[in-house]
């Protein structure tokens, strides 16, 4: 491999902005902030959403009622299943 063309791979602490949940993973991202986590100092990357706050992983997922075209037409013009 050529020297000097690859980014530095290091362990980084990611912190969920919504919940404060932290986890360490390898990354090439750089940060000027650092944080103490589990006895070590890591660069800190703040993320808006992670597995700790995402509805899919937390089980608090909400499903929107997706009406099809026919249902919207029937609702708009007052047709119901009894007619």
From Swiss-Prot:
What Gene Ontology terms describe what this protein does at the molecular function level? Answer: structural constituent of ribosome
SUPFAM superfamilies annotated for this entry? L28p-like
For this protein, the record's PROSITE patterns field holds: RIBOSOMAL_L31
A GO BP entry is: translation
GO CC annotation, single: ribonucleoprotein complex
Q: Which family does it belong to?
A: Belongs to the bacterial ribosomal protein bL31 family. Type B subfamily.
Function noted in UniProt = Binds the 23S rRNA.
Tell me the subunit arrangement.
Part of the 50S ribosomal subunit.
Name recorded for this polypeptide = Large ribosomal subunit protein bL31B
Q: Tell me which species this is from.
A: Lactobacillus delbrueckii subsp. bulgaricus (strain ATCC 11842 / DSM 20081 / BCRC 10696 / JCM 1002 / NBRC 13953 / NCIMB 11778 / NCTC 12712 / WDCM 00102 / Lb 14)
Organism lineage reads as: Bacteria, Bacillati, Bacillota, Bacilli, Lactobacillales
